[in-house]
């Protein structure tokens, strides 16, 4: 039986509608490690440097917004390209081969840890807006129990006023982030967020849940094979809960207004320590950390733009020393901070690479400045 034109038109419209529905279906991506544990706070980008978002505390991003191929990156794992093919899927990430050799404990009065940090402000409309790198010499006196630090840095920005403003308003804060912490993270979290009844629950298999009176805010995962302890937590959520618990209504409303403006916000905080066979670690066992805020915001044209503010810190040298050895180590670790030297340093010390799309934008920024 032949179809009339009207019937053909109806069927064609139905097919088009079905295809539109299928193409609009969310492609849910989950990131896991080789043991099947979720990897939270993985950055997800398109191959042309546009941010899609960040996986949540359970390693999930609900929709990659129709991207055919995505670039995924996390400070503790190797970056990876993944073909979505219009389907939901699971991505297994490989550990980055970053890490200092085991430190030999010696009867020396001082502990020396050099940390390297990098900061970037990224906007998928303009690229990398600000970039800053620095070195901090951390010296811990084992007798007096005091920590002394000194930091050197260099920075580049798309606009000179941004470089000046950031240095004035946040430079000291960033430098402080690069200092090793004398208290374990668990104690720091409990101390800072005591108002929200933070507790740490052992779930077995080397995994602990960090929660407050409103639910989960993070996880602690011990990887005995790698000899590492990994902390992933959402400081933004914990801070908002603390304002609520303290009854600070004005600050809470201000925070809620900011969250409404900064859509799909993720505060992706991460710390990594080396642990011994008994699961113990000391301040000098610090390996790396990340503080990252990611969100969508409308520009002046009313278009949605993704923004990322990120601070990453890496331990690059450590030793038990006396005063003369300390002086020599500091001298050896001095470096002229040109972009080429920075890239060579990162490669030599196996610093995890930035997402290829961000690295490309960073290269453009540095050339523009030079």
Give the ranges of each region predicted by the language model.
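Bacterial Sec-dependent N-terminal signal peptides
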Residues: 1-29
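A short, amphipathic beta-strand motif
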Residues: 27-36, 59, 91, 103
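Short, ordered, surface-exposed loop/turn motifs in non-cytosolic proteins
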Residues: 34-48
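Short Pro-Gly-centered beta-turn/loop motif in secreted/extracellular proteins
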Residues: 37-39, 61-69
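Hydrophobic beta-strand segments
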Residues: 42-46, 70, 105
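Short, acidic Ser/Thr/Gly-rich low-complexity loop/linker segments typical of extracellular
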Residues: 50-60
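A short, solvent-exposed loop/turn motif at the edges and junctions
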Residues: 71-83
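Surface-exposed, low-complexity/disordered segments
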Residues: 92-370
